[in-house]
Design a protein with these regions (language model features):
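Phosphate-binding site recognition
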Residues: 1-234
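A cross-kingdom feature that marks ATP-driven nucleic-acid transaction machinery
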Residues: 205-367
């Protein structure tokens, strides 16, 4: 087994463009017949996929396997913080996502507040410059890409909204978005009930950042760089981050709940095995999480509340009203809550033949 980091190889190829041809000749005539496995790994995705293994590369077609590593699910990410409460585990995941490189930067014996200030906001912290490093490694015109990513982080989700926010032409923004999606920084989301033809047309698709840390960085580091460069870490955190951190974590919490539904479905603990799990929306309403069945007219619809207050019956009633607009007849309801549930909901869920299930924050992290 011969293991190599892609980044040094990329520098070698830039200094000597003939290197892939040399490797091709060596592989074709000698190494392919040896008891040897060569593994090239790293975050320089565009270099590996295009320059090293792409159609125009001498090494094209030589790879016997390509594995794109995905972020860890939240329950594995939580193992980095064994002493954290379930709430703090969810906050850490909302900030860092599931990339081990980011998760290991936080000290599990420090609070969320201390970790953010020490390991993200300080100029000497590796995570402070991580996003810029990745963009410079993969892209040109980073200033324009910064504008596009920042627009999405602030809530612009359609092509027109992003173009308006960045003051760029739609065609230009579309090109940048395509590159960001190829790198796994941005993803396009469709209602979970959308048919393949709808997805192909793309008219209802919404853009969002697929990486939690990118979303945090563009929400709280990028806009306050001048203060952070002057060393005002405490001020930036207390004024701009701490008061809204739970609101910021609301969207990642929805993603966490969707991951939970996938896990429960795979384990056979839902009313049916889900064909798809995602969000649902139309022009008027939105449902945070929804699982649909492949074989019947059934769905599980859910609402996610990351706030320190009990969820009451009004949330369930509103969810029922929204779910009626989906056109799916057989529905089960899930309520996810950081702050628990009021007694009327607990009684309702405990009743026989209830179509309501309550999932508290500790249950989400229960193995």
């Amino acid at each position: 087994l011969s293991l190599h980091d892609a980044l040094p190889i990329s520098y070698l190829v830039k200094s000597d463009p003939s290197l892939p041809s040399v490797l091709q000749n060596l592989w074709d005539h000698t190494l392919r017949h040896a008891n040897l496995m060569i593994v090239i790994c790293g975050s320089a995705m565009s270099f590996i996929e295009k320059e090293l293994l792409g159609e125009k590369s001498p090494l094209y077609g030589r790879a016997t396997g390509i594995l794109k590593m995905l972020p860890m699910p939240y329950w594995d990410a939580a193992q980095f913080f064994p002493n954290y409460s379930s709430e703090d585990k969810a906050l850490a995941y909302a900030i860092l996502g599931g990339i081990p490189r980011y998760l290991e930067e936080f000290d599990p014996d420090e609070t969320i507040d201390a970790n953010v200030k020490r390991h993200i906001l300080r100029r000497i912290a590796p995570l402070y410059s991580e996003v810029e490093f990745l963009l410079h490694e993969e892209l040109r015109e980073t200033a324009k890409y910064n504008s596009v990513i920042r627009a999405i982080a602030l809530g612009a989700t359609s092509l027109n909204e992003i173009a308006t926010h960045t003051m760029m032409a739609n065609a230009t923004v579309s090109s940048y978005l395509a590159n960001l999606m190829e790198l796994g920084i941005v993803e396009r989301e469709f209602p979970v009930t959308a048919k393949p033809k709808e997805r192909a047309k793309g008219s209802r698709g919404l853009y969002q950042l697929s990486d939690n840390f990118f979303r945090f960085w563009y929400s709280f580091v990028f806009p306050y760089r001048s203060e952070l460069e002057r060393g005002d870490v405490e001020g930036v955190y207390e004024r701009h981050i701490k008061p809204v951190l739970h609101d910021f974590a609301g969207k990642p919490f929805e993603g966490l709940c969707r991951e939970w539904m996938w896990r429960e479905s795979a384990a056979g603990r839902l009313p049916f095995r889900a064909r798809a799990v995602g969000r649902w929306w139309d022009r008027q309403d939105e449902i945070d999480v929804m699982a649909v069945d492949n074989a019947s007219d059934a769905a599980i619809v859910g609402e996610c509340k990351f706030r320190n207050a009990p969820v009451d019956r009004s949330v369930l009633n509103l969810l029922r009203d929204r779910a009626a607009r989906t056109g799916i007849g057989q529905r089960t309801y899930l309520l996810f809550s950081l702050g628990g549930f009021d007694q009327s909901l607990v009684d309702d869920a405990a009743a026989s033949q209830s179509d309501v299930q309550l999932v508290g924050i500790d249950e989400l992290f229960h193995e």
